[in-house]
């Protein structure tokens, strides 16, 4: 959430930033709401002050046995109480109107984010590794998985409908191995603390990270009103909600391997075959909580941690910076890491690393107190996939496929596979 004081002082900056995102100007509307609220707050405060003063005057009048004045003052206090009963309710309503309006405004892109309308305007930063030249026509992961007998979409549809997968045998173990490998890398070498968070959260948590109120259609809700997490970013970031974090403990770095649940409401007709776009999928998430001065450097560090996963797996990838029109709602800047999929002959996103500034910190009311200062500041937050486990499975299958349809297991994963070096067709 953006600061209304900052908006009052920088209306043109806000409107220019919204234009970069392809959105209409909103500063005048927000400032008008704020002025209406502030004017009303002024009237309420004046009435409260007069009520308190009149109440004291009643005591003085009674002490002086000036009953006429006392009765007039009592009548005035009664009128003020009646006014305040309605006015304070109106104040809460006006404050909510402003808060609701602010909650739908996206974050301000950093100055170095490239301008653009959609993913075609994203800018490639680097490529690591060269795509393998196969001596045969490489297959897509679902062709490989079904032929091996370890990937079952038909039974998954029987159980749950479209966009689900049943993995069996060594493919199920390979997905588990990938998640464990990523967690071990981030916790033992990258300094992240592993967390096992709830998979269901309250409204406040999903609001804090920015999925609510604007993107509720992308989420699954339980019958008792909780939300299935679309990413572990939600519970990990909200660990510090409504807290003042010790400055000496920053940055806080958390990681988790969790199932994620998404409705894919806007994805009709896209990636309908295979595991690329699922309602339920495994993902390793990284979250950092930092001070204002450290967040830019932390973004580069987090992205490097995600890239290291693919380097260790020997998977070709490229890193791009998203343009203003393709960034997520809460991001100031986002790097996407795209892995090479030979079956599709293209790069596909496997990790997205974003710095959010104090956007989420303000929504969560999460603060820190800089050393030597009395006042607090909102924390800066960052999140990144480290990485999407299902997509990593796809990438390993397609990049390590053999002409006979078997899958070679990358060396980094073999210790997690009980020494197995190849996945072959089920007997």
Curated annotation (Swiss-Prot):
Pathway: Aminoacyl-tRNA biosynthesis; selenocysteinyl-tRNA(Sec) biosynthesis; L-seryl-tRNA(Sec) from L-serine and tRNA(Sec): step 1/1
GO molecular function: ATP binding; serine-tRNA ligase activity
GO CC annotations, alphabetized: cytoplasm
Subcellular location: Cytoplasm
Residues at which ATP binds: 262-264, 349-352
Record keywords: Aminoacyl-tRNA synthetase, ATP-binding, Cytoplasm, Ligase, Nucleotide-binding, Protein biosynthesis
EC number: 6.1.1.11
One Gene Ontology biological process: selenocysteine biosynthetic process
Reactions performed catalytically: tRNA(Ser) + L-serine + ATP = L-seryl-tRNA(Ser) + AMP + diphosphate + H(+); tRNA(Sec) + L-serine + ATP = L-seryl-tRNA(Sec) + AMP + diphosphate + H(+)
Annotated L-serine binding sites: 231-233, 285, 385
Family (UniProt): Belongs to the class-II aminoacyl-tRNA synthetase family. Type-1 seryl-tRNA synthetase subfamily.
Subunit: Homodimer. The tRNA molecule binds across the dimer.
Its job: Catalyzes the attachment of serine to tRNA(Ser). Is also able to aminoacylate tRNA(Sec) with serine, to form the misacylated tRNA L-seryl-tRNA(Sec), which will be further converted into selenocysteinyl-tRNA(Sec).
NCBIfam families for the chain: serS
Domain notes: Consists of two distinct domains, a catalytic core and a N-terminal extension that is involved in tRNA binding.
Name the UniProt record assigns to this protein: Serine--tRNA ligase
Gene source species: Brucella melitensis biotype 2 (strain ATCC 23457)
Gene, per the UniProt record: serS
